[in-house]
UniProtKB/Swiss-Prot annotation:
One of its GO terms (molecular function) is structural constituent of ribosome. Keywords: Ribonucleoprotein, Ribosomal protein. PANTHER family: 39S RIBOSOMAL PROTEIN L28, MITOCHONDRIAL, LARGE RIBOSOMAL SUBUNIT PROTEIN BL28M. This is Large ribosomal subunit protein bL28. GO terms for biological process: translation. The keyword Ribosomal protein applies. The keyword Disulfide bond does not apply. The lineage of its organism: Bacteria, Pseudomonadati, Pseudomonadota, Betaproteobacteria, Burkholderiales. GO terms for cellular component: cytosolic large ribosomal subunit. InterPro entries: Ribosomal_bL28, Ribosomal_bL28/bL31-like_sf, Ribosomal_bL28_bact-type, Ribosomal_bL28_sf. Belongs to the bacterial ribosomal protein bL28 family. Pfam families: Ribosomal_L28. It comes from Ralstonia nicotianae (strain ATCC BAA-1114 / GMI1000) (Ralstonia solanacearum).
Length: 77
């Protein structure tokens, strides 16, 4: 699927634009996705991921090795 974070699974959600007159029209809220390369020291190679900003923060917190292990356990990488 397009526009889905590979780490967190965040995807677009649907909501409303609300005008001053309280008119509502449908819109999509897109996740803040970034294409990033991460150096994996244990494999001695670069890994490219499409991650949201929340996914980047999770990688900073847990480390790329642990996040990649979770992705491989889910069968996504």
């Amino acid at each position: 699927m397009a526009r889905v974070c590979q780490v967190t699974g965040k995807a677009p959600m649907v909501g409303n634009n609300v005008s001053h007159a309280n008119n509502k029209t449908k819109r999509r809220f897109l996740p803040n996705l970034q294409n990033r390369r991460f150096w994996v020291e244990s494999e001695n190679r670069w890994v490219s991921l499409r991650v949201s900003n929340a996914g980047l923060r999770l990688i900073d917190k847990k480390g790329i090795d642990e996040v990649l292990a979770d992705l491989r356990a889910r069968g996504e990488v």
